[in-house]
Amino acid sequence: MLNNLNQPKGSTIGVLKDGRTIQQAIDGLENPVHYVKDVSITPSALLAVAVEAARLGRTVEFGPGHYTNQGQPFEVDFPLNLDVPVGTFLDFPIIIRGKTVKTVRSVATNLTAAQCPAGTTVIAGDFSAFPVGSVVGVKLGDNTNGSASYNNEAGWDFTTVAAASNTSITLSTGLRWAFDKPEVFTPEYAVRYSGQLSRSSYFIPGDYTSGLNVGDIIRVENIDGTDGVHGNKEYFEMLKVSSIDSSGITVETRLRYTHVNPWIVKTGLVKGSSVTGGGRLKRLEVRGVDTPKVNNVDVDRLIVGLCYNIDVGEITSRGVGEPSSVNFTFCFGRGFLYNVRASGSVSTTDNSALKLMSCPGLIINNCSPHNSTSTGSQGDYGFYVDAYYSPYWCWNDGMSINGIVTETPRSAVTRALWLFGLRGCSVSNLSGAQVFLQGCAKSVFSNIVTPDNLLELRDLSGCIVSGMANNALVLGCWNSTFDLTLFGIGSGSNLNIALRAGAGVTHPETGVPTTLGKNNTFNVKSFSQSSLAVTLSIAQQERPIFGAGCVDVDSANKSVALGSNVIVPTMLPLALTKGIDSGSGWVGGRTKGGIWFDGNYRDAAVRWNGQYVWVADNGSLKAAPTKPDSDSPSNGVVIGP
C-alpha cells in the first residue's frame, strides 16, 4: 500500500517495485524512459534495455550509483539515448558506433602493410562472391589502427573489380596507400563522379535515386582534386542529402572542398543519439553518428569521430592519462562545441588535452584545457587543431573559435595552443600561454593575449594576426598582416629580439617548398625596456612593409636590423626611435597629391640623413644637424634661396 502521495517532487517515500519513486513513474508517463537502478546489472541485461529503448524511441535513465557493467565495455550500433543524472557513475566504456560505409559483403585478411603496399592490385583471399566490374572498397582491418609510418591511419580506397576468384581479387586500379590487415568490401551504394565538384556548391549533378534518399549521409572521396592542405589530393568530406531527384542531389551544407573525379559513397551513420544528465562516465566514444548530442556530463575520456552535426557542451573531462582527454576527428556539417574543461592528458608525441582533427564548420566557444603532460621530446598541448591524419589532409575550413584559455603544459615543449591547417576561419580570444599558428590560410586571428610568452607564426597565407605577446617569431608567411604589441625580447635564436622574421618551409595552399616570405605587413609596438632590444630583425622577406603602427622606446638598441635576403623593404611613416639598417632596396610610402607639413622649425622639420630641414619664416630653406631651437640656430645653414 502506498502512502504520503502529497510528498514533494522527487520524494523517496512510496517506492515502486522497480525502484522508481512515484514522481519518477509520473514523469515516465509524460516522457517514457527505461529506468535502470540495479548497479549490478549484467552486460546482457543492459543491452536488452538499450535495444528495447531504441525500438520504442525512449531514453535509458540510470538511477544514482556506481555501475561497472561487470568490467565490460558497452557497445551498440543503433541510436542510444542515455540520462546519467548527478550521483551516477558509469564506470565502463560506452561506445556508439555507426558505419563509415554501409556494406553488403566483406572479406578480412591478415596481410601486413608490407604485403599490401601502395600500388597493390592483387589481394589474396576468397573473393568468389565479388562480381567483375562491381565497386569495392578497401579499409584497414578492425583490429589495427594503421600507422603514419606507411601513411595510413584512417584511409579508405574505392575502385572496381577487374577479376575475382576463390583465391584472389584483382583491382582495376592500384591501392592509393598501404593497408594493414586490409578488409575488402562491397559498399551498398557507391558511384564515381566524372568531373569537378566545386567548393561552396550545394548541388551534385547526376541521378542517384537508385541508392540514396533524403536524410542519407554521403562520403565524397576526392581522387584527382588538389584542394587539401599543402595542395594534397588526399581528402574527403561528409554531406547530408537535403533533396534528391533524377537531376542530382542538393546537400544540406555547401561542399567544403573542390573534388575532381570523386567517389560518392553511402554511409551507415547511426541516426541520432544523446548522453546528458549531469553525472559521470568513465569513457564515451561516439563514432559514426548523425546529430549526436553530449551535454552536461563529466566524461573522463571523450572521443567523437566521423560524425555529422555534433552538439557537445558543458563537459568536464579529468582525463585517464591517454594522449588526449577530449578528441574530435572528421566531424562535418554544422557542429557546436562549447563550455569544455579538459585535463589529464599524457603523451610522448604531439597531442593535447583537447584535440580537434579536420572538423570544418565547427563552432567552438569557451574551452579551458589544462594539466597536460609530455614525457617525450614532442609536446602534449592544451588545445590543438590539426589537419593531417594520414593519409588525409582535410582543411579545418570555415571554423569559428572563440574563448580558449589554457596554460603552459608540463613538458619540455612549452607550446600550449597549436593551430594548423585552418582556412577561412575566425579565431579570437586566445590566452594563457604560448600560441603557435602554422600552415593557415585566409583566416583572422584576433585578441591573442599571451604577454609572458613567445607567439609563433609560421607559413601563414593571407592571414591577419593581432594581439600581444612577450616576443614574436614570423617564419615565411605571405600576404599577411601582423598587428602586435610586444613587451619583451626573446632568447636562443631570438636573443634580444622583439620580433624576428625568417625563412618559411611550405606554402599552406600550394604545398610548394617556399622559404622566402612575401608582402607581409609588420605593425609592431615594442615596449621592452632592455638596452639590448632589437625591435624588428628581418631576414628572408620580399617586400616586407613596416607599417604606420610601428613604435618602440628610447632605451631600445636598434629599431630595424636587416639580415640576408631582404628584398625591397618598404616603410610607412612610423614612430620607431632607434637605428634602422640602410640598404639599396629600401622604398618609401607612396602618395599622390603631396604631403603637407604645417608649422615652423618647431614642428614642421623633416629629418633627412641626420639633418633637420625646414622652411624658415622668411621663406628660405634651412638645415641643421640638431633639432632647431629657433628659426636661425647657430649651427644652421641656409640652403636657399
Swiss-Prot record:
Transmembrane segments: none annotated. GO terms for cellular component: virus tail. GO terms for biological process: adhesion receptor-mediated virion attachment to host cell; symbiont entry into host cell via disruption of host cell envelope; symbiont entry into host cell via disruption of host cell glycocalyx. Optimum pH is 5-8. Signal peptide: none annotated. The keyword Transmembrane helix does not apply. It is found in: Virion. Keywords: Degradation of host capsule during virus entry, Degradation of host cell envelope components during virus entry, Host-virus interaction, Viral attachment to host adhesion receptor, Viral attachment to host cell, Viral tail protein, Virion, Virus entry into host cell. It comes from the Viruses. Optimum temperature is 20-70 degrees Celsius. Its main location: virion. The keyword Nucleus does not apply. Homotrimer. Interacts (via N-terminus) with depolymerase 1 (via N-terminus); this interaction probably gives rise to a branched tailspike. In the N-terminal section; belongs to the Przondovirus depolymerase 2 family. Functions as a receptor binding protein (RBP) and probably mediates the attachment to the host capsular exopolysaccharides. Displays a depolymerase activity that specifically degrades some K47-type polysaccharides of Klebsiella pneumoniae capsule, which allows the phage to reach the host cell membrane and bind the entry receptor. This is Depolymerase 1, capsule K47-specific.
